């Protein structure tokens, strides 16, 4: 991937001795033009400093040309300092979140080993968190990165040698009258003023931001008590850094002042340069109008001819390779699927996800209702192995697995054919059809159904099948509301007693176990983790992660349920379930606790699916110290004390095996 690096170094416009004296005095600034003999060079004639352009994965640096003497001796104390600047972050992609900028104090003029994207041009994968960096920064971040424990996609943080902030807060300010907190959106067309002030005597670093038309608030947004002396050298460079990733933003500095041992001069807002106008909408309209007026007739003729040729010659074309002969009974003709789905019309669309669209249809030869998942698979390498696995999975027979009937391969597209489930997915009943709510008995039955199907995949077939994408959207319901696990598009096979090979991390956010995200190695235990999340989701009636939850404690489902266990675990139950007077509180509590058990972050602690079925059937009881085991997720080292219990719970149980010999299908790899 091609990276674009934009580095702007502020150069001196006057003599070097004059600039040196000013840096030693520790005061400089610009306000949209050169003044006070600061010698700062601007980036354009209007005084607007732009850190990044419209390139993807780029970063920009702007540094004052001369170092600032923060200490009088190597072992001395860092002097007090104050700086204020006006900045703006403008999205280039319809206000989508990109990446932010940072004010930085660095031992070098420029950060030669920095990276773009989430690293903000400050650090890279290797040196992030290295104590030898000697970098102090204040980030204005517009992207939430889980690896740095970011609270949201609109926050301000104080960073020392690492992008995991010492202290952070959602961007905003406190009103002077009553202390009310007001949010500020960092990405917009309106400039924002920031103040960063360090009191050497109190060893306190304060950060304040506010709209430029308002005075500086009395209460800072962030206040960190920390001696900066160990982190800063005698002389350091000050400046700004910003970065873009796949989503691009433009970063501007409109004005900036800095002072040692005093308060930085305020910026004259009336003399700031103007931000460039967003001309994208106007330009697009003009281009469209001209293009349509000149080429509408030609395009119409071209599309008509192309459509007719496509219908007549190529729409039903497919290639059958020699190696597919052995899978013949599992292969459908594209023509049959095309007719069954009425040409894959949108009116026949059942749903779509990250791995393909699903259409309903009826086979004309047998009048059988089917579901067809259309999957893009444009890599020829591995296609034969993939089709072989599909044919193998097609031989599965279990009442709680959706039948995979076969496949069709055409050019770079793959079609998986399943039994059609008339009631649709569990996801629809949990979130999209409030008028058709499920009572507790139905929910508990679905949980047991999915557990039975998953246990069959893990323990009762001739090979181990790891599903890798367990979630409500992949649990389908028949006319009797029986739950069936479907969509084997990501499934992996391995022999009993052997570990599966490492592959790309696949699945759905919120259901991926910690060890899978680290190692890329899926296992039956990672399936158990996802099943635990599914149990909690069915019981609580909410998604695994709610970025806009009413309180931080409710953002992550597992954390919320665990917190409530200490008080009353039943308070997390879906209100629609509570309306049913017949629901069994003891049964609900069992499912919630078992869900936390299965979703434990340490794989060795999780039970096997055989054990899960015994817990659900009441054949076995949950451990008496389960709360301590689950609570230990907050301190991974604490689980060592439960090692023997974890190993015994992970042993598979004896469950009757269901054996069938007819062919089988599902929707989607």
Swiss-Prot record:
The active site is at residue 469. Keywords: ATP-binding, Cell membrane, Glycoprotein, Kinase, Lectin, Membrane, Nucleotide-binding, Receptor, Serine/threonine-protein kinase, Signal, Transferase, Transmembrane, Transmembrane helix. Residues 344-603 form the Protein kinase domain. Residues 38-259 are annotated as: Legume-lectin like. Gene3D superfamilies: 2.60.120.200, Phosphorylase Kinase, domain 1, Transferase(Phosphotransferase) domain 1. ATP binds at residues 350-358, 373. SMART domains: S_TKc. One of its GO terms (molecular function) is protein serine/threonine kinase activity. It is found in: Cell membrane. The keyword Kinase applies. The chain crosses the membrane at residues 287-307. It catalyses: L-seryl-[protein] + ATP = O-phospho-L-seryl-[protein] + ADP + H(+); L-threonyl-[protein] + ATP = O-phospho-L-threonyl-[protein] + ADP + H(+). Residues 1-21 form the signal peptide. Residues 308-669 are cytoplasmic. It comes from the Eukaryota. Its EC number is 2.7.11.1. The keyword Cell membrane applies. It is an enzyme of class 2 (transferase). Residues 22-286 are extracellular. Glycans are attached at residues 53, 75, 124, 206, 261. Pfam families: Lectin_legB (PF00139), Pkinase (PF00069). In the C-terminal section; belongs to the protein kinase superfamily. Ser/Thr protein kinase family. In the N-terminal section; belongs to the leguminous lectin family. This is L-type lectin-domain containing receptor kinase V.9. It comes from Arabidopsis thaliana (Mouse-ear cress). The lineage of its organism: Eukaryota, Viridiplantae, Streptophyta, Embryophyta, Tracheophyta.
